[in-house]
């Protein structure tokens, strides 16, 4: 049976045969898709550079948030333990030296009515206590990089600074109000020179170790030793000035007030900085 013309069944075009465009429309040529490789490669350096900038700006804060100091990335384990032992030796040396100087300075303060000598004696006691806190800080070998232990030591140092500064300022103001005149002799000179030199040397050692170990407690202990050295030389300065000009009797007490206020300001700054960090790192205790 023959089929009528036009009634043939048309098979759909195969996948390889393109469908002709409708009448009245020009054939559209598809534009080739852009290659995303150059774009991604051009953006990759910027994306890599941005994390590096942010990481460099918040490097130490990131490690402290995890309970570690920045020294954990700077020092190898054996290097950290070596510097920890050096910090312990310097702290023991500081305790012995400053304790002897404190006894001598208290003797000078009582015998010669020197407010600066009293202030130095109090600062020497503070140095003994701060060095003892540093001993506790580095007594545990496993806690050499512990941020929480570091901040606790700094908070204790801040409280001691406040108490000592109050005692120094009160004693100096009392001496100024009663017009106490310091006496000058060879013993006063010997104590002031010896204390100034020894405390300055201890301060340099503590600053160096504190920088390597990134320890705020060691740096604070070094600041305290530096104040002790300045007070030792101030005893010599005020005594020499009073020897040549008795009208400047207030220099000794004024130096005592100035040093006491300096210690007070440092203690307040230390507490403001460290108390929030103790709370932040209390869940990351790295010591037993």
Curated annotation (Swiss-Prot):
Reaction(s) the record says it catalyses: Zn(2+)(in) = Zn(2+)(out)
Family of the protein in this entry: Belongs to the TMEM163 family.
Predominant cellular place of this UniProt entry's protein: membrane
Lineage, top ranks: Eukaryota, Metazoa, Chordata, Craniata, Vertebrata
Required for interaction with MCOLN1: region residues: 41-71
Residues that bear Phosphoserine: 11, 54, 56, 60
Organism: Rattus norvegicus (Rat)
One GO biological process term: zinc export across plasma membrane
Cytoplasmic compartment residues: 1-87, 137-149, 208-216, 276-288
Membrane association type: Multi-pass membrane protein
Name of the protein in question: Transmembrane protein 163
Intracellular or extracellular location(s): Cytoplasmic vesicle, Secretory vesicle, Synaptic vesicle membrane; Early endosome membrane; Late endosome membrane; Lysosome membrane
């Amino acid at each position: 049976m023959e089929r009528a013309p036009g009634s043939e069944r048309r098979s759909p075009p195969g996948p390889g045969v393109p469908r002709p465009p409708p009448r009245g429309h020009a054939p559209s040529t598809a534009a080739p898709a852009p290659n995303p490789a150059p774009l991604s490669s051009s953006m990759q350096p910027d994306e890599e550079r941005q994390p590096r900038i942010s990481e460099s700006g918040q490097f130490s804060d990131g490690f402290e948030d995890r309970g570690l100091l920045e020294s954990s990335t700077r020092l190898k384990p054996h290097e950290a333990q070596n510097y920890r032992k050096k910090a312990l030796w310097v702290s023991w040396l500081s305790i012995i030296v400053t304790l002897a100087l404190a006894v001598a300075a208290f003797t000078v303060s009582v015998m010669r009515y020197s407010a600066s000598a009293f202030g130095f004696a109090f600062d020497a006691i503070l140095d003994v206590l701060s060095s003892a806190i540093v001993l506790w800080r580095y007594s545990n070998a496993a806690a050499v990089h512990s941020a929480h232990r570091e901040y606790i030591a700094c908070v204790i140092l801040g409280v001691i600074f406040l108490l000592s500064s109050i005692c120094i300022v009160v004693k100096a103001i009392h001496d100024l109000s009663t017009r106490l005149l310091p006496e000058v002799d060879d013993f006063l000179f010997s104590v002031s020179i010896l204390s100034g030199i020894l405390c300055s040397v201890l301060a340099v050692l503590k600053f160096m170790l504190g920088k390597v170990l990134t320890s705020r407690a060691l740096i604070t202990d070094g600041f305290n030793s530096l104040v002790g050295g300045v007070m030792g030389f101030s005893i010599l300065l005020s005594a020499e000035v009073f020897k040549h000009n008795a009208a400047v009797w207030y220099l000794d007490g004024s130096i005592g007030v100035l040093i006491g206020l300096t210690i007070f300001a440092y203690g307040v700054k230390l507490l403001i900085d460290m108390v929030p960090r103790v709370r932040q790192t209390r869940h990351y205790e790295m010591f037993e």
